[in-house]
């Protein structure tokens, strides 16, 4: 499973990249707003930190303007992945971009039917929002399971990029189902390393080591 950081905060991305766990980055208009940075500038900086896909989202709603925005965004760096909404115009844009060799992330997916359309349109990634799905009384992981089954049935190459990840249980469940990628805030990714018994074990080892009076260095 690939790990993408869902953030536009440069320091957080650098910290995660230093661990070797970062495979890519996803951004959206809300994250750009939160960063307080210029969209083009921050996207370019992120692309310089990771060689993996960096999702940058168009904000137009019609195909023609989406294409113009996509042209500007994909000129930033070779690893820019154009993010489009799961609408008919978004799918049309996805098809045009993918036919041209550009990575596309089709976002705001809330049904297996939508995911099927994204794959048919040649999407590199489809982003089902599990947390938001759960918030509205649905089962986000059932959605991931359905998409996995459909994609396996027809050998679609589109990768399932689990988004709106709220906690480490989402990550575990997505991995067990076989999702290709998950994107989450860096704090969620870092939290995967935490376990109370690991901390307790370290404390015990250090206490016993101190009692030996030795030093490795």
UniProtKB/Swiss-Prot annotation:
Keywords, alphabetical: Cytoplasm, Pentose shunt, Schiff base, Transferase
Pfam families noted in UniProt: TAL_FSA
EC number: 2.2.1.2
GO cellular component terms attached to this protein's record: cytoplasm
Subcellular location per the Swiss-Prot or TrEMBL entry: Cytoplasm
Domain of life, per lineage: Bacteria
Pathway connected to this protein: Carbohydrate degradation; pentose phosphate pathway; D-glyceraldehyde 3-phosphate and beta-D-fructose 6-phosphate from D-ribose 5-phosphate and D-xylulose 5-phosphate (non-oxidative stage): step 2/3
Substrates-to-products reaction catalysed: D-sedoheptulose 7-phosphate + D-glyceraldehyde 3-phosphate = D-erythrose 4-phosphate + beta-D-fructose 6-phosphate
Predominant location: cytoplasm
Family membership: Belongs to the transaldolase family. Type 3B subfamily.
PANTHER family the UniProt entry points to: FRUCTOSE-6-PHOSPHATE ALDOLASE 1-RELATED, TRANSALDOLASE
Annotated HAMAP family: Transaldolase_3b
Role summary: Transaldolase is important for the balance of metabolites in the pentose-phosphate pathway.
Protein name, entry field: Probable transaldolase
Species assigned in the record: Erythrobacter litoralis (strain HTCC2594)
Source species taxonomy: Bacteria, Pseudomonadati, Pseudomonadota, Alphaproteobacteria, Sphingomonadales
Gene: tal
